[in-house]
UniProtKB/Swiss-Prot annotation:
Designated name of the protein: Protein ApaG
Organism encoding this protein: Shewanella piezotolerans (strain WP3 / JCM 13877)
PANTHER family (alphabetical): F-BOX ONLY PROTEIN 3 (PTHR14289), POLYMERASE DELTA-INTERACTING PROTEIN 2 (PTHR14289:SF16)
Alphabetical GO biological process terms: error-free translesion synthesis
Gene: apaG
InterPro entries the UniProt entry points to: ApaG_domain (IPR007474), ApaG_sf (IPR036767), Uncharacterised_ApaG (IPR023065)
Family annotation (HAMAP family): ApaG
Matching Gene3D superfamilies: ApaG domain
Coiled coil: none
Length: 126
């Protein structure tokens, strides 16, 4: 697998979903909206995802699977694909990071890294 710079840029926005969270039961729901931008010169298809989710207690969970939100999108050069998903933590703070396995139109497979981002109840961190 080629480990050169990825032609993919990943942007993340997160939101705490207070209405569906129950802190007394250690259930904190977060949504995250991901924008995947193809900066390369070929179509790329997202084949699978890998996430490592760590809560404030250091508990880690790994999530792997085909595509995202039931899709394996093909992203044309200089365009973007966006989706929203969510996760539940047992603590009011956590971190997610991972990668997407992508395939270029020429058949070359590569990993597009997703840098670590925070999930936090507003006002918790100063």
């Amino acid at each position: 697998m080629n480990q050169r710079l990825s032609p993919i840029k990943v942007e993340v926005k997160t939101e705490y979903i207070e209405a569906q969270s129950t802190p007394d039961e250690e259930k904190y729901l977060f949504s995250y909206t991901i924008t995947i931008i193809n900066l390369g010169d070929q179509d790329v298809t997202l084949k699978s995802r890998y996430w490592c989710i760590t809560d404030a207690n250091g508990q880690q969970s790994e999530v792997e699977g085909a595509g995202v939100v039931g899709e394996t999108p093909t992203i044309k050069p200089n365009t973007a694909y966006q989706y929203t998903s969510g996760t539940v933590l047992e603590t009011p703070f956590g971190v997610m990071e991972g990668n997407y396995t992508m395939i270029k139109s020429n058949g070359e497979e590569f990993k597009a890294p997703i840098s670590a981002f925070s999930l936090a109840v507003p006002g918790l961190l100063h």
